[in-house]
Amino acid sequence: MQEIMAKLEQLENLNDLERLRVEVMGKKGILTQQFALLKNLEGETKKTFAKELNKNKENFEKMLESKRESLLKVQMNENLTKEVVDASLFTALRPKSNGHPIYQTMDRIIDFFVNMNFAIQTGPLVEDDFHNFEALNLPVFHPARDMQDTFYFKDSMLLRTHTSPVQIRTMQSQHIPIRMIAPGSVFRRDYDLTHSPMFHQVEGLVVDEKDKISFVHLKYILEDFLHYMFGDVRIRFRSSFFPFTEPSAEVDISCVFCGGSGCRVCSHTGWLEVLGCGIVNQKVFDAVGHKNVSGYAFGLGVERFAMLLHRVNDLRSFFETDLRVLEQF
């Protein structure tokens, strides 16, 4: 058996290893034939011989497996050495993406406000009724709720209809001063040329001690922002109504399609509505437990801005994954 073990140690490939295994443990192998002799023995002689054979078999199997693992590693290293990849091999270049126009627009919006020291805040897409409606001065039977067709789940949970809940959560968790924007996806049951059931908003909120924030501050930041986005356009603020701000305003810019002279896109008014804003209603501060504070808020639809920046008439073209359209941006 020592001679077999010595032979095993000297083997250099798996084929020779398999031949030795058959030579020792095959049907006509050395150990197999020795085990066959046991039937001719009796008593202690048989017992002693069987014990010795089992020991030899066990030792051989262990050394066989150890040698197999060793040879497999050698073979693997040889294969890896041979399989060299030629990194210089020419391949057809794939066209690079420029980014989706909606996210290009969102990034541009975010960049402006980050440079103005606004922090980015995020929140859950699935919201509860309190954060999405009630805390924003929209109680259960408020008529303004009729303006929003909402995707509801069970137990008063819903897909958020705006990113305003992020403002509520931020005011609940942070102390003043607060200076934040909330970009993200929102959901409403609407789908046509200018509406999508899933779209994107960026809302902003600034809160500080009472009387430190005025409409003048809001007007300044939004005028600066709109000139940054659309260049030398005229801007006007119109009185409006939102339950969560008082006073409230909607902001228009001179039509980017006709320069303000009047066209089909602006309904021949020369103006395009781009966002809503106002001074935060005191009832909103009461809902989150803030006293003696003031602030302003604003919100805009990213798709609306993308359509104006890229002169796109049908919002749905942004979502149809038609490369002929997307490659233009």
UniProtKB/Swiss-Prot annotation:
What EC number(s) is this enzyme filed under?
6.1.1.20
- Which positions form S-S bridges? none
The protein's predominant localisation is cytoplasm
Q: Which organism is it from?
A: Helicobacter hepaticus (strain ATCC 51449 / 3B1)
Q: Where in the cell is it found?
A: Cytoplasm
Record's keyword terms, sorted: Aminoacyl-tRNA synthetase, ATP-binding, Cytoplasm, Ligase, Magnesium, Metal-binding, Nucleotide-binding, Protein biosynthesis
Instruction: Cite a single GO BP annotation.
Output: phenylalanyl-tRNA aminoacylation
In Swiss-Prot or TrEMBL terms, this protein is called Phenylalanine--tRNA ligase alpha subunit
Reaction(s) catalysed by this chain's protein: tRNA(Phe) + L-phenylalanine + ATP = L-phenylalanyl-tRNA(Phe) + AMP + diphosphate + H(+)
Q: Which gene encodes it?
A: pheS
Cofactor details (free text): Binds 2 magnesium ions per tetramer.
Named cofactor requirement(s): Mg(2+)
Q: What class of enzyme is it?
A: ligase
- Molecular function GO terms recorded: ATP binding; magnesium ion binding; phenylalanine-tRNA ligase activity; tRNA binding
Is the keyword Magnesium assigned to this protein? Answer: yes
A Pfam family the protein falls into: tRNA-synt_2d
**Which InterPro entries did the record assign?**
aa-tRNA-synth_II, aa-tRNA-synth_II/BPL/LPL, Phe-tRNA-synth_IIc_asu, Phe-tRNA_ligase_II_N, Phe_tRNA_ligase_alpha1_bac, Phenylalanyl-tRNA_Synthase, tRNA-bd_arm
Which GO CC annotations does the UniProt entry carry? cytoplasm
